């Protein structure tokens, strides 16, 4: 099959970086270099160019989709003769550990909140819906943190369902990477946003991913637009190790850090432990549970070196 035939039969439209960047049209840059610096992750070089060429076209596309969704809601209200409330638009962001999901989520939150049509954009990570460490230890799942069985899926689905139903003041648990656990009584309140961005490893998973916990409704059932942040496995491993080394010099030095004992490691020891953690936990989770969900996404962003996106695939 030729490349042309593959494109015609693919469920995705594919764009290289320059083709995607051209779709920005006249959308203005609304972030300063200082704001971008505060949005980037510990392991990334996020530039004005990256925001302009990748994220501004994406924010333009999302604004079109959101506006179309609002028109559809208006049609339904006209048909029913009601004046209902606005239903939040839910965007999910999935991908491997260390790929940069959180940065993508923060940049989109900042850009979308600057569109006049939808000022209130909330960001929630699914880490908060992990079972507390006490439960994971009881179930012998501490080395499976991030795997499907480590999440309180009933609570996560209830949260997303409530948001989509327009329920006010919905609470979401908050996770601390410092203590490596859910914060007791640290819930965040989400009150009827225009847009909810939901970021996490598991937001594209469905029933077949949870044979141990059968239920019929999933997060993906409530999502309006889903993004998968992708990268080659060798880069993911390198980024994970580099991030671990930076944490060793930063967050791990805090005496309250769950991983404080790693701060005393030599660089070689730290690289060896990070490599082991990657292979035994994160790579395994990627292969078994995360990567198989990639083709369920509305849009796939593929990164190359330096976290630069060089390919975008958009579902037709």
UniProtKB/Swiss-Prot annotation:
GO terms for biological process: coenzyme A biosynthetic process. The keyword Secreted does not apply. It comes from the Bacteria. Disulfide bonds: none annotated. It is an enzyme of class 2 (transferase). One of its GO terms (cellular component) is cytoplasm. It comes from Cronobacter sakazakii (strain ATCC BAA-894) (Enterobacter sakazakii). Pathway: Cofactor biosynthesis; coenzyme A biosynthesis; CoA from (R)-pantothenate: step 1/5. Belongs to the prokaryotic pantothenate kinase family. GO terms for molecular function: ATP binding; pantothenate kinase activity. CDD domains: PanK (cd02025). Keywords: ATP-binding, Coenzyme A biosynthesis, Cytoplasm, Kinase, Nucleotide-binding, Transferase. The keyword Protein transport does not apply. Pfam families: PRK (PF00485). ATP binds at residues 95-102. It is found in: Cytoplasm. This is Pantothenate kinase. Its EC number is 2.7.1.33. It catalyses: (R)-pantothenate + ATP = (R)-4'-phosphopantothenate + ADP + H(+). Its main location: cytoplasm.
């Amino acid at each position: 099959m030729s490349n042309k035939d593959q494109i015609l039969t693919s469920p995705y439209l594919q764009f290289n970086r320059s083709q995607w960047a051209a779709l920005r049209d006249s959308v203005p840059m609304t972030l300063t270099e200082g704001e971008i610096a505060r949005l980037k992750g510990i392991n990334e070089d996020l530039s004005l160019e990256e925001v302009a060429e990748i994220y501004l076209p994406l924010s333009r596309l999302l604004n079109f989709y959101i506006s179309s969704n609002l028109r559809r809601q208006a049609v339904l209200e006209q048909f029913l003769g009601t004046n209902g409330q606005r239903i939040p638009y839910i965007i999910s962001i999935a991908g491997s550990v260390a790929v940069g999901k959180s940065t993508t989520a923060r940049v989109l939150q900042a850009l979308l909140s600057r569109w006049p049509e939808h000022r209130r954009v909330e960001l929630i990570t699914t880490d908060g819906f992990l079972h507390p460490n006490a439960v994971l230890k009881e179930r012998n799942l501490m080395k499976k943190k991030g795997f499907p069985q480590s999440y309180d899926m009933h609570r996560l689905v209830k949260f997303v369902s409530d948001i989509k139903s327009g329920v006010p003041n919905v609470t979401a648990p908050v996770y601390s990477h410092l203590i490596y656990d859910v914060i007791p009584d640290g819930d965040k309140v989400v009150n009827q946003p225009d847009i909810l961005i939901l970021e996490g490893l598991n937001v594209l998973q469905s029933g077949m991913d949870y044979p141990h916990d059968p239920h019929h409704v999933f997060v993906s059932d409530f999502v309006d637009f889903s993004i998968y942040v992708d990268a080659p496995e060798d880069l993911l491993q390198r980024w994970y190790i580099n991030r671990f080394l930076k944490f060793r010099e930063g967050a791990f030095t805090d005496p309250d850090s769950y991983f404080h004992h790693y701060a005393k490691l030599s660089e070689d020891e730290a690289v060896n432990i990070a490599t082991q953690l990657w292979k035994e936990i994160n790579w395994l989770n990627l292969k078994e549970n995360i990567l198989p969900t990639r083709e369920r996404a509305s849009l796939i962003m593929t990164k190359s070196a330096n976290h630069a996106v060089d390919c975008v695939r958009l579902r037709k």
